Amino acid sequence: MKKLFVLSLTLFCFQQSQAQGIQKFIKKMYFDKDSTKHSSFVVLPIVTSAPETGLEVGGAGLYSFYSDTITANHTRVSNIYPYVSVTTKGQSHFSVSTDHWSPKNLYHYTASVSYINYPFNFYGIGNNTRKADADHVDEKRFKLDLSDAKLVTKNLYAGFVAGAYHYSYFDTPPTGIFITGPQIEDRDGGGGIYIGPSLVLDNRDNNTYTTKGLIINAYYKLMKGVFSNNGYTGGFFGIEYSQFFKLNSNLILGLDIQEQSLTGGSSPFYLLPSLGSDEMMRGYYNGRYRDRNFIAGQTELRYRISDRIGIVGFVGAGEVAHGKFSVSTLKPNYGGGLRYFFDTEKGLSIRADYGIGQKVAGEQRQSGFYIGLGQAF
């Protein structure tokens, strides 16, 4: 009896100690203020459910740090972002990405590797696809993306981008648009590698919560198919311009414009730029609209209520096109969101946004809810 009492007491103390440890860990991640340049780590649990996946569970993390803690050097925040989830129907999503700034910001490196075994809805190609044509497609995708840029003069970086990819697709209904659509090239998927130059102009005051300054990032990928897709050659051009204006101590106005184009004679559908994400054109399903060219712009007003809490409102427009863009076919989006700053020294936040898009005749208005780490741009 004494042994049982001692064992029960030991287990109770252990559980209490564990609970206190978890509470301290959560408090440190989300609520403690740290004015030093120490590293920090935060975790976001993932629990969702959908008919095509069943229950999905997982988590995302953000480890942030400085490669140089000497204040006078103004070295920017670096981070590592892991993401993993699995579903009860056997699908999975794994990725790790990093954004690294060397001491004094002389070099900037990024790297990302991901594997996705996950279904998505394919609506066809073009700027006027219909929800009724949605085709459920299973995708297996591997991607590796790398970049390296060196500071060559004040605020100007020059470097390269490189990477590899492989896509595989499986479509159950043989009569769906994914199989029957005449515009769809390489519907079985394919692999490839790429390399190309990049140029970045960046004078932002902060890379995690910018209050003033601008960044212009341009790159071109020279792409070559491999294995069964060995005959493919092409290119991909992208440019993004973002600028921030400090209206007062708590109010920031941000502008963001992106353009992407697939070049070359072929148009593998999985390489086509697509409209809609948690960062640009919030409110649209990613891939609802896709084509050889994509353009979009947005403006976001950010109000910092306190050190911890912020709110935003955003409005934008964008479209995809096979050739030239047209102002008359731009699709609108607007919405708002909440920010919680878990690391006030580094300006790191958790964001929750609700975006609203176009109302297509005969369909419900398009919309989306997003939770993520960091700012949208």
What are these regions (language model features)?
Residues 1-23:
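Bacterial Sec-dependent N-terminal signal peptides
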Residues 22, 26-39, 67-77, 103-108, ...:
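Short loop/turn motifs that connect adjacent beta-strands in outer-membrane beta-barrel proteins
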Residues 33-41, 48-191, 275, 287-288, ...:
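Gram-negative/organellar outer-membrane beta-barrel architecture
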Residues 41-43, 78-82, 108-111, 158-160, ...:
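Transmembrane beta-strands of outer-membrane beta-barrel proteins
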Residues 44, 60, 97-99, 147, ...:
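Outer-membrane beta-barrel architecture
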Residues 70, 118-124, 167-173, 206-208, ...:
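Outer-membrane beta-barrel proteins
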Residues 196-197, 335-342, 365-377:
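Outer-membrane beta-barrel "beta-signal"
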Residues 206-305, 311-314, 321:
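C-terminal outer-membrane beta-barrel translocator/porin domains of Gram-negative envelope proteins
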